Amino acid sequence: GDICHKHNLKFIVDAAQTAGSFPINMEQMHIDVLAFTGHKSLLGPQGIGGFLVSDEVAHEMIPLVTGGTGSVSDSEFQPEFMPDKFESGTQNIPGIYGLHAALCYLEETGIENIHAHEMELCKAFIEKIDALQNEKIRLVGVRDMNKRGPVVSFDFIGEDNAEVSFKLDSEYGISTRCGMHCAPNAHKTLETYPQGTVRFAFGFKNTMEDVDYAVQAIQKILQK
């Protein structure tokens, strides 16, 4: 944030993978815009998301979508006040209520507690995979737990990553996300393009037994 502001740039954070599992303070981190989805670590339903903006950005930004808001209906122009300025059309009320219930649970549980548990599982998972000493397994990302989140991506050398992901699901009941994760240029930089990676994401309800089961499943698949 500091670097962006020194160059008169806005600092925009995509918190799709971190909101709900990582403590975020927009003011301390100098974040101008924070975009999030509700269905991942925020534990809400699909089809709901949002963005938090600073007062400055809220004033300067021009809405991409305009239309009826249910307020200032006698005007042909978009309202300038928040949140109506960016909320045209009928809102996803069931999604909003679902996300609200999820946020209440997260607040009661504590983001710090969730983050600590998920990172403990992440650390154990990486260590146990490393212990296999299998040259086919390439961790994509850093091992420093202070510089990563509880999402782990692997590139299985010499294997079809999509096939590995399919077998994890069909044979072991383990859901992963395979592919380029809406970031093809990132995968080009990481040299995982065009196959992408197999991504594991740990949640608060996962256990150490789940970690052991996933490691064993990977080991068995690569032995076949």
Language-model regions, residue ranges each:
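Pyridoxal 5′-phosphate
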Residues: 1-224
